[in-house]
UniProtKB/Swiss-Prot annotation:
GO terms for biological process: fatty acid biosynthetic process. The gene is KCS21. It catalyses: a very-long-chain acyl-CoA + malonyl-CoA + H(+) = a very-long-chain 3-oxoacyl-CoA + CO2 + CoA. It is an enzyme of class 2 (transferase). This is Probable 3-ketoacyl-CoA synthase 21.
Length: 464
């Protein structure tokens, strides 16, 4: 038999129940006072808990890890495992990559021959993670034992014990800390971690969460000849970020941003999307991460999917109305050609954009699809130029750039958007709740006055 389930408010009461209470000697005032208390408790429970971004830091490698283009191309030329065709291919990619001579890689990858080992990757991850966390805790005068939730993410290095356990061990965190380690989630894992932290902070009100995002280059540095796998060597560089979030109302005055929305989209059910970024072995049994030519078109599809869900949450009603009308005219009445369909103006919803620095093609595609200006893409373009593709932490380098430039004002809204293997497209929306001034821990501060710089579309780095 079908039964209808009725949802009732916790403060609802029938006439008979009220009569029973009154006849038992309870006053009307006491009844309504009790109902008011229950109502306030209910409202507090059901009301969305506000989650704040207190602070974050990015990792900046020492100059000894700097890899100028000339050094990198020389290392490639001296690698006897590569043929001339593979060497020329990497040189062409590097020349058009927008990367500068200031990006960094682990010391183990500068040796000839390259030194790939478990001990090397452990040194790399400990260096980036520990330095980022130490900087963040020192900057905010926090004890490691004050952290309630810990989330680490690193796509291609998943040791046992986990990276989160490594952090707990290093900083002697509490035994009851809620810790999570995410692996294999690609460059979109930074926002994914924010989403997980948000859910946990909503459930555990008043808690403090620490997110650490990084990638291990030593693990996936490719030493074969497959072109699709050589791309990662050309684009990925050393980096990490540590992020501090809170759901404690008392932290609002010290917070920089409030989290408004997180939208996550995944297309792993589609084989083409699933395999466009794929860890595999080549014909010579060499392990690497393959990036196929489908990645740009898949990313474009995923971007549309994400923005379709994000739009109604952030766009002004007029902008949404214009989109609906144009969509009807385009699809139903066929007045417009399909390639001239209306694209909502997301600049009406955001003052700033932090795009994942997946590469030159990713940033240019975002610029075209969202009709962004050179100023809009400047934080991501300069991040790619100065630090390279630092994977899941790249969106924090871009936000750090905006802070160093003193562009973040109270009330400003910023969109962080990232793509990752799977295939995923994740976005996070933050609102600045006070004017943000850069401090001494900002890794851009020493040279921010020289930015933005003119980034040539192509440079010649090949000898001879």
């Amino acid at each position: 038999m079908n039964q209808t389930i009725h949802r009732v408010s916790p403060i609802s009461m029938s006439i008979s129940e009220l009569t029973t209470l009154l006849s038992s000697g309870v006053s009307v005032f006491e009844i309504f006072a009790g109902l008011l208390v229950v109502h306030l408790i209910y409202q507090r429970i059901r009301t969305r808990v506000k989650v704040y971004l207190l602070d974050f830091t990015c990792y900046r490698a020492p100059d000894s890890n700097r890899v100028p283009m000339s050094t990198l191309i020389e290392t490639i030329y001296l690698d006897d495992k590569l043929d001339q065709e593979s060497i020329d291919f990497q040189a062409r990619i590097l020349e058009r990559s927008w990367l500068s001579n200031q990006t960094s890689i682990p010391r183990s990858l500068m040796e000839i021959p390259l030194k790939k080992s478990l001990s090397s990757v452990k040194i790399e991850t400990m260096t980036t993670i520990f330095t980022s966390v130490e900087d963040l805790l020192r900057k905010n005068k926090l004890s490691p034992r004050s952290i309630d939730i810990l989330i680490t993410n690193c796509s291609l290095h998943s040791p046992s014990p986990s990276l989160s356990a490594m952090v707990i061990n290093k900083f002697h965190m509490r035994s009851n800390i809620k810790s999570f380690n995410l692996s294999g989630m690609g460059c979109a894992a930074g926002i994914l971690s924010v989403n997980l932290a948000n859910d946990l902070l909503q459930a555990h009100r008043g808690s403090l969460a620490l997110i650490v995002s990084t990638e291990a280059l030593n693990t996936h540095w490719y030493i074969g000849k497959d072109r699709s796998m050589l791309l990662t060597n050309c684009l990925f560089r050393m980096g990490a970020a540590a992020v501090l979030m809170s759901s404690n109302d008392h932290d609002r005055d010290n917070a920089k941003y409030e989290l408004l929305h997180v939208v996550r989209k995944n297309k792993a059910k589609d084989d083409r999307a699933y395999r466009c970024i794929y860890q595999d072995i080549d014909s010579d049994e060499k392990q690497g991460v393959s990036i196929t030519k489908d990645v740009i078109s898949v990313a474009g599809d995923m971007l549309k999917m994400n923005l379709t869900s994000l739009g109604p949450l952030v766009l002004p009603y007029l902008e949404q109305f214009q989109y609906v009308i144009q969509h009807i005219l385009c699809k139903k009445l066929k007045i417009y050609e399909s390639n001239s369909s209306y694209t909502p103006n997301f600049k009406t919803a955001f003052e700033h954009f932090c795009i994942h620095t997946g590469g030159r093609a990713v940033i240019q595609a975002m610029e075209m699809n969202l009709k962004l200006t050179k100023v809009d893409i400047e934080p991501s373009k300069m991040t790619l130029h100065r630090f390279g593709n630092t994977s899941s932490s790249s969106i924090w380098y871009a936000l750090s750039y905006l802070e160093a430039k003193r562009r973040m004002k109270k009330g400003d809204r910023v969109l962080q958007i990232a793509f990752g293997s799977g295939f995923k497209c994740n976005s996070a929306v933050w609102r600045c709740i006070r004017k943000v001034e850069p401090n001494t821990e900002n890794k851009w501060l020493d040279f921010i006055d020289s930015y933005p710089v003119d980034v040539p579309d192509s440079t010649n780095i090949r000898p001879g």
